[in-house]
Amino acid sequence: MNLLIKGGRVIDPSQGIDANLDVLIADGVVLELGQGLAAPEGTPAIDASGLIVTPGLIDMHVHLRDPGLEYKEDIATGSRSAAAGGFTSVACMPNTSPVIDSKAIASYIINKAKSEALVNVFPIGCITKGGKGESLAEMGELKEAGCVAVSDDGKPVCNSELMRRALEYAKGIGIAVISHSEDLALVGEGVMNEGFVSTELGLKGIPWAAEDIAVAREVYLAEFAGAPVHIAHISTVGSARIIRNAKARGVKVTCETAPHYFTLTDEAVRGYETNAKMNPPLRSAADVEAMKAGLADGTIDAIATDHAPHHPDEKDVEFNVALNGIVGLETSLSLSLKLVEEGRLDLNQLVSLMSCTPAKILGLDRGTLKVGAVGDVTIIDPAKEWQVEAAKLESKSKNSPFLGWKMKGRAVYTVVKGQVVYQA
């Protein structure tokens, strides 16, 4: 597809570009960047004056629930939600039914995405067979099938020797390992952050140590193996400190956090609000500040949503039995732009966190507007105001703690391979 994007503020950290430029896409790839570009007659054009033009945003941690759990979400609805949030690519976690631990399931997702998805969908395979944490999955086959990473997300690989072998094997074949880091014995029957609020509500708590201990293990295993590891959804002061120190001594560790961890505290659980129930749980104000600081100083490499759709019947129940997780694809950019408005990040940092660096971690040929690159583009209006309403969310599920919130800033065009797949 051909497209001319005219006069926007192009921000592309992969090239060190922050300037008002035109972007010309031809046959789905970036043909030229410059001022006053001319396009062949009949080429569609977008006037991006006053708007921000970035490489397509990438969410490296989503749950599309397909196969097997399509009553919550499916590839079509999840991709519509992604497009509405400004994401041109998503990487989907393997805790489906059946799990993504075979070439057949990975191929199913890739083929279904080709016919139904508005955006690029990259599957993540399991670290272990069946996601059971007992023996390694066929990582080589998963990579050959198109998986961009492996993870047992939803639960940790508890066996340290098995995780060591996973890191070493993944290093050998060049695939990213994403760790869901928590000590299940410490988590116990906890359902929210352990602290004043959990005590007041009479709910069993999950201590910050459950995350910190598990993150420390992954760091030491990666250091020992000389292998990279990516830590999913960090949420604590300690996790950020451990990773910051590890990076300083050369450990190949990267990590992500989610918008809810730098926006909400465990106070959001008051009223037994199940849309504020997730894993890891919402933490304290000090933890929120640590996430903002980690994003600002480069300790945290990526912002990922952990988009986790659930049917109302799984959320409209007692807090103790409600399932963990929230939808996040359509609110992520607005919540992240708030950090720019607050002066905690600049736009170049934000684009790196939401596009360039996720692409690098997953080994994707995305996250850049270099000539010859795939023509995936997100066009953002930083001043556009909107309200989060369940009826207007594209996701099949509506389990968001941000319903009713007034937001500022959102994607107004999402472009995949030169084709506009979403327009606000």
From Swiss-Prot:
GO molecular function ontology, one term from the record: allantoinase activity
Catalytic activity: (S)-dihydroorotate + H2O = N-carbamoyl-L-aspartate + H(+)
GO-annotated biological processes: 'de novo' UMP biosynthetic process; purine nucleobase catabolic process
Source species of the chain: Citrifermentans bemidjiense (strain ATCC BAA-1014 / DSM 16622 / JCM 12645 / Bem)
InterPro entries assigned to the protein according to its UniProt record, in alphabetical order: Amidohydro-rel, DHOase, DHOase/Allantoinase_Hydrolase, Dihydroorotase_CS, Metal-dep_hydrolase_composite, Metal_Hydrolase
Family the entry assigns: Belongs to the metallo-dependent hydrolases superfamily. DHOase family. Class I DHOase subfamily.
This protein's name: Dihydroorotase
Cofactor note: Binds 2 Zn(2+) ions per subunit.
Function: Catalyzes the reversible cyclization of carbamoyl aspartate to dihydroorotate.
SUPFAM superfamilies assigned to the protein according to its UniProt record, in alphabetical order: Composite domain of metallo-dependent hydrolases (SSF51338), Metallo-dependent hydrolases (SSF51556)
E.C. code: 3.5.2.3
HAMAP family found in the cross-reference section: PyrC_classI_B (MF_00220_B)
Residues that, per the record, bind Zn(2+) 2: D153, H180, H233
Active site: D306
Transcription among keywords: no
Pathway: Pyrimidine metabolism; UMP biosynthesis via de novo pathway; (S)-dihydroorotate from bicarbonate: step 3/3
Required cofactor(s): Zn(2+)
GO cellular component, one term: cytoplasm
Binding site for Zn(2+) 1: H61, H63, D153, D306
Residues that bind substrate: H63, L64, R65, N95, N279, H310
Entry keyword set: Hydrolase, Metal-binding, Pyrimidine biosynthesis, Zinc
